[in-house]
Amino acid sequence: MSQKSRHLALSLVPAAILAGACAPQPAATTTPTPVTLPAKIGTNPFFVESSLPYHAPRFDLIKNEDYQVALEEGMKQQLVEIDAIAKQTTPPTFENTIVAMEKAGALLTRVSKTFTGVVGANTNDTLQKIQDAEAPKLAATNDAIYLNDQLYQRVKSVYDRRSAGNLDPEQVALIERYNRDFVRAGAQLSEADKTRIKSINQELSKLSTDFTNKLLAGTKVGALVVDNPSQLVGLSNDEIQTAADAAKQRGLNGKWVLPLRNTTQQPSQAELTNRAVRQKLFELSTLRTERSDTNDTRSTIRRMAELRAEKAKLLGYPTWAAYALATQGAKTPENAIKLLTDLVPPATARARSEAADMQKLIDQQGGGFKLQPWDWQYYAEQVRKAKYDLDESQIMPYFELNNVLQNGVFFAANKLYGLTFKERHDIPVYNPDVRTFEVFDANGQPLALFYADYFKRDNKQGGAWMDQFVDQSALTGWKPVVYNVANFTKPAPGQPALLTYDDVTTMFHEFGHALHGMFSNVQYPTLSGTNVPRDFVEFPSQFNEHWALDPAVFANYAKHYQTGASMPAALVAKIKNSQTFNQGFSMTEILAASLLDFAWHTLPAGSAPQDVDAFEAAALKRYNVDVPEVPPRYHSTYFSHIWDGGYSAGYYAYTWSEVLDDDAFAWFREHGGLTRENGARFRDMILSRGGTVDAATLYRNFRGRDPSVEALLEQRGLKSSDSIAK
């Protein structure tokens, strides 16, 4: 997998939880109406603001049962506060309505943000039961706010007079965001339609949680279990030991377990020499939630697609995709689909050429079989070795996790932005794997708190993501508390954590999101940090990936974990020369997943398919991404991004943002690359602005023009393939 094939979702917990608190979520130290706390205040750490630095969560005090009590009380408090705002007799103003809403729900925000982080990265049966019980209630609380006509009339009054007062641009942006969100929630609908919207939201919240639980269980159960290490020939001794340790953790002594990653293709397929084992691993991956058992998600996703289409129709949109993209940079599904389909010819042409190279190698080796999806990773690695004299085992000793983090990711942030980092061992964490760092600005002032949780666990959702326990806001005076989560293979005890190059770029990617949150410099929580359109939020993260191969950065972290020797220049050259290798596959699997997402979410109301597999096959064929050897990065039944990750009709955002990030990096190359001056400009014009300015305007101000797709084609090595429509 290439750097651009890694995915990141800001969070992979259910969207019902993400949006459960008043959306946009507030974060405040005061509330407009005094609320009497229950007697349990003495034992529940959520009922008081954290006394830790940066108001970090009190993981040393929080017990599982505290979440449910605090969520329930938080919802009650918020509704009392909102009711007081709605029923004011004084005329609506920016302060008594909009700012009051920003300050409402402090307890609910505090607990929901913490719960979101823990249930995604360190869940258990108790937390899952709480999630099941509370998600519908959180959705109902959200509806009680955004479908409150009395409250909406106050918001609308402020909105209608936004140009008449002495409001600054950020205040106007906040008013416009609130009005937009009320309208999109259904505030202008009839009472009958509001009732139906509430019912749909309740069911969707339950289905989203249902999907999450099924996928987590299906992924765990779907792991490859082998009885004999001879089946694992090709894996390193450390990898085989890690598989043995994974089996022991499951009570399977004397066996070996390869846990599934969240994607269709599995990293181990690149090394396993036994073709039957590769096939078995591939099939376990693709069928993880499609076995007609309790973890089967087919009925869940059909119903979700059906309900989303119905909701969109009630809100005046022809499809869910039209509704979802109305607030995005792409504006319409047609615009997003055009970008994707324009990229299909060069991507699939390259993929077929890559497949031909592999088939030639198979034939030369007397394989006697046709290349299949489970063969791709293995033979791609063989071709890479032949073409570039490079294989993963050569480079992993130079990518030790802590070295990559501190001398790579942090080093680049220092050179660009002047940041420094100090590990804190006194901040409690939710799992022993988690590390905490205090981040200081160039002037030495405290900027943020950063949590790093990189190793795979069975109770952690798949993939990698960033989110925040605390949002930056001048209104509250709070600084950001940010976390990165990944699923890197945990080494055996006493062994170093050695990363693939793909893992390295994942670290840079997620930290790009973290910087977006840390550098936020806005007044209001709703507009803070990563609260931007989905097809813009991936821009800072994907942009940050580019620094992984910057000569100065790479030389600082790519050092042998045993000797400390820098990676030999010849090996560095091989890595750089191979950057466009396998890009046909990488681009095609992403395009296939993105277009599959649109196939589901451009369905009109009442047309959800009965046969998921047949629908998917027809969609891939319709969009000309049905390359047999290159399945979608995610099949429908385990496509977490679009069913429970907040990216419904939004997976295209990675490609849309890639146009921005490659084009922006071209600007950096033209202006001296890794310099503090360039970093300051990017921070000031992009990373610090949150959602206070239209995303397209932000980019245009930074670049001096609209983005061009040319840099993406060059970065991917696709310019020599079939021409692309401009």
Locate the predicted segments by residue:
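Bacterial N-terminal signal peptides that target proteins for export
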Residues: 2-10
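C-terminal, non-catalytic "cap/extension" segments appended to globular domains
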Residues: 35-62, 66, 234, 242, ...
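N-terminal helix-rich structural modules
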Residues: 28-242, 668, 726
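Bacterial signal peptide processing site
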Residues: 23-25
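Short pre-active-site segment immediately N-terminal to the catalytic Zn-binding motif
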Residues: 489-508
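Active-site-proximal, well-structured secondary-structure segments within enzyme catalytic domains
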Residues: 170, 174, 203-206, 213, ...
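C-terminal motif of bacterial Sec signal peptides marking the signal peptidase cleavage site
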Residues: 18-21
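Short His/Asp/Glu-rich catalytic/ion-coordination signatures at enzyme active sites or charged loops
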Residues: 51-66, 115-134, 157-199, 259-299, ...
